[in-house]
Amino acid sequence: MLDILTFYTYFVNPTDQGASPIITNLRILITGSNSGFGLLTSLTLARQGHHVIATMRDLDKGAALAATAEAEKLPIEMRTLDVCDPASVEAALADAATIDVLINNAGFEVQGGLEMVDDELMQKQLDTNVIGPLRTIRAVMPAWRRRQSGAIVNVSSTVGIVATPYGGAYSASKFALEGMSEALYMEAKPDNIRVHLIEPGRFSTTNFGSNIVRPDGWVGSELENRQIAFRKALSNLDGKAPPDPQSVADAIVNAAIDPAAPFRNLVGDDAVMLASAYKAAPTYEDFEAGIRERLDWHI
């Protein structure tokens, strides 16, 4: 069994993976750049001098990013890209051979009891969070295999390692992204193409509310009341507010530009705690009991 110290070193601390030169002046395409982690990552990379291709479904929603880029004279190019539209993906990535890094950040979260998620909503969750990244990956891989270089950074979540209640649909999408990324890591390595996962814990940004969808009948239900109690219990992890989301952007940036970055990158103390506890527990029942005790959560 992987002990917690080894787990932390391997999954979290990229400095222990061996020194390697940081790559500069990259052309980096990011999906979902109009808000949240995508917005922060776009600005962070551009401020470091990389050419950022910031993509989103609706360019009108990228006004804040465009204004900052213009004010600071940042190397940011805006493109329309809807990961759920194959034609849009093909058009946005037609110049894949000139792109060095692909960051799959676009996504949304379905919150609600699993039995309340209908087929249409579940299909939308998987199409955006799983099939969408697969579409962008398919668009770049042929050219990258020919030139023998490239890097893919998939933004996942701690719930892609261990599911949490009242978010089963979202967890399912992130579990799928994790499995897809593990397979791609091994498939792409012979052609010198890097693959990385970013696994944030709980983070708060003012722009994330619009990326959450709840099923019909959820608001005011008994299951919603239980979810509220669970989220309140999460504050017992450290007794503090969620950390600065810039730390997630920094982890994405590091994976994009540092060839020595690890495959998995947990971000946040709660992410480390949950993943470590899950890996260390002899059984799932032991993990569940331990989490209930740690959170003082008994509903």
Predicted regions mapped to residue ranges:
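Residue(s) in the substrate-gating loop at a strand-loop-helix junction
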Residues: 157
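Active-site helix of classical SDR
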Residues: 137, 173
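Substrate-binding pocket helix/loop in short-chain dehydrogenase/reductase
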Residues: 113-114, 121-123
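SDR active-site lid
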Residues: 190-262
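Conserved glycine-rich cofactor-binding loop
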Residues: 34-35
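The beta1-alpha1 cofactor-binding region of Rossmann-like NAD(H)/NADP(H)-dependent oxidoreductases
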Residues: 80-91, 119
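Active-site-adjacent segment of SDR/Rossmann-fold oxidoreductases
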Residues: 162, 183-194
